């Protein structure tokens, strides 16, 4: 099966959605959605509940098939033809809002289990590797501020630390694109600040798409913002420009 497409006549992209529509029982979750993310870019996605943010992530990862439109990764791979596992193997990792970690195992073993190569939920979502060394684990845990908790049980971590551990489980696979869903939901203020710094650090070496409701956190990310409403993009630009957009104020931020 040929999954390659002709690259669009525009600058190179890591993720390109064009005219993507998805309907569920007559409800249009995505309505001709178009999005362009450059390599090495971190993009924040905001919007009210039901705007299509989760469906967009589901389409990118292969969980949901679009009714129409293009979904292209790395300028040439048609994601609509691939399974979730195949998309993960390409280098797209997703972190859901609720952290999914192995609570009865240590922090370090969580990273090992995520990359065990067994056909588990984790390996299907995030791909697999034959082995990961202790040194590689140390590097990843240091990056997510969990070095001091290497031998702690994951179940003993705070909510924020569990979120960071799941990010570590993604980073160990070295994905090209990370999709991060509401990473600071339920976090303390200090954890939220640390998470903003963490994602800015990750964005130095990876492309990142962050879905988030916390506007203070989005501002701290200091990146281009896309606002969705009823399955379409209604505003895009800096956080200041998007926050001042009357359409965004009306449907999302309130007056």
Predicted regions and their residues:
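Glycine-rich phosphate-binding loops of nucleotide-dependent enzymes
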Residues: 2-255
């Amino acid at each position: 099966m040929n999954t390659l497409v002709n690259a669009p006549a525009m600058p190179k992209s890591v993720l390109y959605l064009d005219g993507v529509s998805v309907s569920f029982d007559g409800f249009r979750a995505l309505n001709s959605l178009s999005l362009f993310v450059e390599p090495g870019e971190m993009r924040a996605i905001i919007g009210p509940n039901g705007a299509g943010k989760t469906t967009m992530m589901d389409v990118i990862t292969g969980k949901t098939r679009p009714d129409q439109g293009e979904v292209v990764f790395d300028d040439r791979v048609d994601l609509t033809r691939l399974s979730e596992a195949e998309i993960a193997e390409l280098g797209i990792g997703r972190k859901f809002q609720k952290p999914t970690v192995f609570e009865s195992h240590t922090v370090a073993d969580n990273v090992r289990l995520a990359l065990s190569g067994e056909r588990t939920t984790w390996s299907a979502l995030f791909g697999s590797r034959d082995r990961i060394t202790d040194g590689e684990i140390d590097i990843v845990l240091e990056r997510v501020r969990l070095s001091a908790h290497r031998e702690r049980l994951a179940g003993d971590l705070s909510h924020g630390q569990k979120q960071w551990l799941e990010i570590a489980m993604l980073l160990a696979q070295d994905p090209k694109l990370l999709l991060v869903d509401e990473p600071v939901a339920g976090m303390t203020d200090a954890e939220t600040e640390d998470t903003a710094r963490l994602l800015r650090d990750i964005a130095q070496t990876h492309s990142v798409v962050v879905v988030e409701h916390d506007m203070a956190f989005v501002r701290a990310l200091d990146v281009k913002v896309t606002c969705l409403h009823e399955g379409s993009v209604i505003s895009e630009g800096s956080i200041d420009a998007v926050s001042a957009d009357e359409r965004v104020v009306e449907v999302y931020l309130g007056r």
